[in-house]
Swiss-Prot record:
GO biological process: translation
Subunit annotation: Part of the 50S ribosomal subunit. Forms a cluster with proteins L14 and L19.
Membership in a protein family: Belongs to the universal ribosomal protein uL3 family.
Gene3D superfamilies: 3.30.160.810, Translation factors (2.40.30.10)
UniProt xrefs under SUPFAM superfamilies: Translation proteins
InterPro entries: Ribosomal_uL3, Ribosomal_uL3_bac/org-type, Ribosomal_uL3_CS, Transl_B-barrel_sf
Coiled-coil annotated spans: none
Function in brief: One of the primary rRNA binding proteins, it binds directly near the 3'-end of the 23S rRNA, where it nucleates assembly of the 50S subunit.
Gene Ontology cellular-component terms listed: cytosolic large ribosomal subunit
Alphabetized UniProt keyword annotations: Ribonucleoprotein, Ribosomal protein, RNA-binding, rRNA-binding
A Pfam entry, by short name: Ribosomal_L3
GO molecular function, one term: rRNA binding
Source species of the chain: Nocardia farcinica (strain IFM 10152)
Name of the protein: Large ribosomal subunit protein uL3
Length: 221
C-alpha cells in the first residue's frame, strides 16, 4: 500500500461508469467502482503569493463552443484551450509543478493510494421521515390509528412555541453533494484512462465525480 503522506496532493475530474468485481493477488473478490478519469486540462493556477492559497483549476468534458457564455469562453481562450463542460478547482501542495494547458490523466494516482471521491447522490424525490432519516415509526397496533409512519411531535405548544431549525422532517431526499473518504485505488489503467476504486462512490452511472488525494492520508491503511 502507498502512504499518501509522502505523496503530493492530486486530483482529477471523471465520470462514474458503474460497479464490477475483480480478483486480488489472493484470489479474493474485490468490489470496485470504475471511473473514466480525465483527460483534464489545467486552465488556471492559484499561487500562495498571488491568491493566498495553492490550487489548480482543471476542465473536463466536451461541449459545443456555442453553448459557452462569453466570460467563460474568454477564460478558456486566455488559457489557450478549447472550451470544456465542467470546471473544478483542486487544492495542491505545490502549484509550481503544473502549467496552464497541461493535461492530467488517470496516472496521476498510484495503485494502493487512498482517495476521497465527491459526487452528487441519486435523487429519491419527496420522502417521509422513515425513509429519509431512518425513523422507526409508531406502533403497528394497540390503538394506533393511521399514524404508523408519522414522525410524531416536532415541538412543544407554548414552550418553545416554534419548530427548531434543523428538525428532521419529510422532504426531498438525495441529489446532494456527497464525499466518500479514504477509498483505496485498486488499479490504474492509464492506457484506457480508468480508475478502479475499491467500494461504492456517490451518484448515478454517468455522473461527474471529483477524485482527490485523501485529506486524512489513508487513515485506515
Amino acid at each position: 500500500m502507498t502512504d499518501n503522506k509522502n505523496r503530493p496532493a492530486a486530483g482529477i475530474l471523471g465520470t462514474k461508469l458503474g460497479m464490477t468485481q475483480v480478483f486480488d493477488e489472493k484470489n479474493r473478490v474485490v468490489p470496485v467502482t470504475v471511473i473514466k478519469a480525465g483527460p483534464n486540462v489545467v486552465t488556471q493556477i492559484r499561487t500562495e503569493e498571488r491568491d493566498g492559497y495553492s490550487a489548480v483549476q482543471v476542465a473536463f468534458g466536451a461541449i459545443d463552443p456555442r453553448k459557452v457564455n462569453k466570460p467563460v469562453a474568454g477564460q478558456f481562450a486566455k488559457a489557450g484551450v478549447t472550451p470544456r463542460r465542467h470546471i473544478a478547482e483542486i487544492r495542491v501542495a505545490d502549484a509550481s509543478s503544473f502549467e496552464v494547458g497541461q493535461e492530467i490523466n488517470a496516472d496521476v494516482f498510484e495503485e494502493g493510494s487512498y482517495v476521497d471521491v465527491t459526487g452528487t447522490s441519486k435523487g429519491k424525490g419527496y420522502a417521509g421521515t422513515m425513509k429519509r432519516h431512518g425513523f422507526r415509526g409508531q406502533g403497528a397496533s394497540h390503538g394506533a390509528q393511521a399514524v404508523h409512519r408519522r414522525p410524531g411531535s416536532i415541538g412543544g405548544c407554548a414552550t418553545p412555541g416554534r419548530v427548531f431549525k434543523g428538525m428532521r422532517m419529510a422532504g426531498r431526499m438525495g441529489n446532494d453533494r456527497v464525499t466518500t473518504q479514504n477509498l483505496s485505488v485498486h488499479k490504474v489503467d492509464a492506457e484506457n484512462g480508468l480508475l478502479l476504486i475499491k467500494g461504492a462512490i456517490p451518484g448515478r452511472k454517468g455522473g461527474v465525480v471529483i477524485v482527490k488525494s485523501a485529506v486524512k492520508g489513508g487513515a485506515h491503511a
